[in-house]
Amino acid sequence: MEKIVAKKKFGQNFLKDESVLQKIIEAMPNNDNKIVEIGPGLGDLTKFLVDVKSVDAFEVDTDLCKVLQNKFEREIATKQLRIHCGDVLTAWKSELIEESYDLVANLPYYIATNIILKALADPKCKNILVMVQLEVAEKFCANDGDKVFGSLSIITQSVGEAHIVVNVPPSAFEPQPKINSAVFLIQKKSDRSDKDFEDMLRVAFTQPRKTLMKNLSSTYDKAMLQEIFEKLSLAQTIRPHQVSTNDYHQLYKLARSLDGTRERTEC
């Protein structure tokens, strides 16, 4: 068989360390959900997944689709595996699959954050177990007060719980990336928070080294913010990463309430 060369445009790094693959399988939540795998590559993780559950795999690389179709001919025939050739983000414009599912994947780094946020927003997705760049995993799993605590951490904490399963060195891949990776798990308890809340978070963390007051006052009324900060006992010098997830939710609720009150008063 012709050797498959990893393509940079698809961010391909094939996971070859079977001990890491086994740890991913061991970390999978125990349930009856289907599995969605994005970027199955050469099928190194897929071969473990189809042994335990039925899998829908989404692969954008047509060359790899052919490899997968040949490699898993039996599993495809028994409907243990369905391979979808094409861009998963295009497929996600409608329903990805009909059933409840867990996302389990070694994600291409260049679209990892976007895919995780899409999965968090998808009510059919119940758990997310993925390999990503270590820096990205730390942001999703950060706790209140951590230096890397930010909007991704808050969005994640708002819908469930997250933790890093295992750190993965470059030597586990072929070709070897220049960065460290990690597998992490998000267990969803509810659906993703609303868009307006996430818009506020983006403003709050626009310049992480600035104060939260300064960042928010670029978009929101400063007098209103001062009133909210006082109600929540937040110092006006506090920085974005020093505010808890709960306080961000309270801040958002008060901002909506006060905005609505002022609009009615002005009318």
Swiss-Prot record:
Its EC number is 2.1.1.182. NCBIfam families: ksgA. PANTHER family: DIMETHYLADENOSINE TRANSFERASE (PTHR11727), DIMETHYLADENOSINE TRANSFERASE-RELATED (PTHR11727:SF7). It is an enzyme of class 2 (transferase). The keyword rRNA-binding does not apply. This is Ribosomal RNA small subunit methyltransferase A. One of its GO terms (cellular component) is cytosol. SMART domains: rADc. InterPro entries: KsgA/Erm, rRNA_Ade_diMease-like_C, rRNA_Ade_Mease_Trfase_CS, rRNA_Ade_methylase_Trfase_N, rRNA_adenine_dimethylase, SAM-dependent_MTases_sf. HAMAP family: 16SrRNA_methyltr_A (MF_00607). It catalyses: adenosine(1518)/adenosine(1519) in 16S rRNA + 4 S-adenosyl-L-methionine = N(6)-dimethyladenosine(1518)/N(6)-dimethyladenosine(1519) in 16S rRNA + 4 S-adenosyl-L-homocysteine + 4 H(+). Belongs to the class I-like SAM-binding methyltransferase superfamily. rRNA adenine N(6)-methyltransferase family. RsmA subfamily. The keyword Nucleotide-binding does not apply. GO terms for molecular function: 16S rRNA (adenine(1518)-N(6)/adenine(1519)-N(6))-dimethyltransferase activity; RNA binding. Keywords: Cytoplasm, Methyltransferase, RNA-binding, rRNA processing, S-adenosyl-L-methionine, Transferase. It is found in: Cytoplasm. Specifically dimethylates two adjacent adenosines (A1518 and A1519) in the loop of a conserved hairpin near the 3'-end of 16S rRNA in the 30S particle. May play a critical role in biogenesis of 30S subunits. S-adenosyl-L-methionine binds at residues 13, 15, 39, 59, 87, 106.
